From Swiss-Prot:
One of its GO terms (biological process) is methylation. This is Methyltransferase FUS9. The lineage of its organism: Eukaryota, Fungi, Dikarya, Ascomycota, Pezizomycotina. Its EC number is 2.1.1.-. Binds 1 Mg(2+) ion per subunit. The gene is FUS9.
Length: 355
């Protein structure tokens, strides 16, 4: 069992902050919509009075709704059950507001059938719903987050190899659990950040700016080196080969209909490039948007590093102050070193059928 410092128990930034800064995830979701439409055609032929759809890793729900609508439009069933799940630390208040407002708007208008909504505070690396109870499951922009950071081995095995092994175990665990939950003939749709076959580093500008800002804070004595050493975002970007190796273990359980890689650009870059010669104000606005996007994911891990690296030596107010310093300096480094640079990311997309 991993100790608490290695467990991935940090939620996305709460109080609507993550949902307000998830534009790249939205772009990635749009590329997955054809997979949902294909899965919906299969579900439409299911002879059942109740159809159950489960999302694994809903966060605040803002990128859950268009996939749900793509499915609901094609399902002529008597009742629909939508289940939104995430880790217990997730901001379920924001998720509830997002989903409820959306459901209230479509029931009786676009949707005539009863709609039943549930939220489940449970990691998708555990069983989330009863066996053979779901007709379609999906997870978007979440599965690159690992269950935990693997601890160093006595033989000094390379960290990247340990992360790759953990990512293999985690994806296999996820697929095994979902195979128990999804009925035969049901579908599973996945998208997650991947290692680009083209060789570029995902969102390299923001990542480097974050790193340099933290190094400067250490050099200036703002934070001790132990905090920087404790900072970890427990993710691994799988290659297509990594994914295929896992899928080879499930040939008797899952049929692969789609498996491909695609590039996703942060939409703020397109808005910036509409201007032939962006103003300094536009460049600063772009930096604000892309760094706030990254911080919506990473800020909680910085706060955790402050707690672990200082052994609880900071007050809540001091943690918030240091976080703000890090965010501000990251934006300054991005403007200095990566002004107007594209923010691009590779995603892997998968559509599976339960055999």
């Amino acid at each position: 069992m991993a100790d608490k410092s290695h467990v991935n128990n940090v939620p996305m930034q709460g109080n609507g902050a993550y949902s307000s800064h998830a534009a790249l995830q939205h772009e990635a979701m749009l590329k997955a919509l054809p997979l949902f439409q294909a899965a919906a055609e299969v579900i439409a032929n299911v002879d059942s009075t109740r159809i159950s759809i489960v999302e694994y890793g809903s966060a605040h729900g803002n990128n859950s709704l268009e996939p749900m609508e793509a499915i609901l439009k094609s399902i002529p069933t008597e009742s629909l059950e939508l289940l939104f799940s995430d880790r217990p630390e997730n901001d379920f208040c924001t998720l509830s507001k997002t989903v409820t407002a959306w459901a209230d708007g479509i029931v009786g208008n676009q949707l005539l059938n009863p709609l039943f909504i549930s939220m489940i505070p449970r990691s998708f690396y555990q069983q989330v719903v009863p066996p053979k109870s779901a007709h379609l499951g999906f997870s978007l922009a979440a599965l690159h987050h690992l269950d935990h950071v693997p601890q160093p081995t006595e033989d000094g095995q390379d960290e990247s190899e340990l992360l790759q092994q953990q990512a293999h175990v985690d994806l296999a665990t996820f697929l095994k659990l979902r195979s128990q939950e999804i009925v035969s003939g049901g579908s599973l749709i996945l998208s997650f950040v991947s290692q680009a076959s083209a060789g570029y580093e995902n969102y390299s500008g923001p990542v480097d700016a974050c790193r340099n800002a933290m190094i400067e804070m250490v050099q200036q004595g703002k934070i001790p080196l132990s905090v920087a050493q404790a900072f970890r975002v427990p993710t691994y970007n799988r290659t297509l080969s990594d994914v295929k190796k896992v899928m080879d273990e499930f040939t008797q359980t899952w049929k692969v209909h789609d498996l491909f890689e695609d590039d996703v650009m942060h939409p703020a870059f397109h808005k910036l490039k509409i201007q032939s010669n962006p103003s300094l104000e536009a460049s600063h606005k772009y930096a604000e948007v892309v760094i706030d996007w990254m911080m919506a994911v990473c800020s909680g891990y910085f706060t955790k590093a402050l707690q672990v690296g200082s052994q609880g030596g900071y007050t809540k107010q001091e943690e918030e102050g240091l976080l703000q310093v890090w965010v501000t300096r990251t934006k300054e480094f991005f403007i200095r070193d990566y002004k107007d640079k594209e923010v691009i990311c590779s995603f892997i997309y998968i559509r599976l059928e339960r055999l």
